[in-house]
A protein has these predicted regions:
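N-terminal intrinsically disordered, cationic/polar leader segments
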Residues: 1-87, 91-112
């Protein structure tokens, strides 16, 4: 991963094989970021996204592998109980035009 700061903005390139949430956390801790918004695009080949079913009060995760383009990745960095916390949602599409997404649990970059 490589990143640069431009005032209050950070632009990052996460390398092939790296996990997105781990890299976001690394930057946030290194730069002492306590509050931020995030947006991203790129290609991934392995990701897990979840959905909270409010009527059941239960969380469900779905795991996907294959070639995907990130359609949207957006969210926030903040703190919870004084510790780093990120809340990101992602949608990713495959070569058939199918799009899957939800609360991002993990995603591996496949191309930069």
């Amino acid at each position: 991963m490589e990143y640069r700061k431009f005032g209050n903005t950070i632009i990052a390139r996460i390398d092939k094989g790296e996990e997105i949430l781990e890299q976001v956390k690394e930057i946030a801790l290194k730069e002492n970021i306590k509050l931020a918004s995030i947006q991203a695009l790129g290609a991934i080949n392995d990701f897990t996204a979840g959905v909270f079913k409010t009527d059941e009060k239960k969380y469900y995760s779905n795991h996907f592998t294959g070639s995907f383009e990130i359609v949207s990745l957006t969210g926030t960095i903040n703190t919870m109980d004084g510790e780093f916390y990120s809340h990101l949602h992602m949608s990713a599409g495959n070569d058939k035009g199918e799009v899957f997404g939800g609360h991002l649990n993990q995603a591996i970059v496949s191309a930069t």
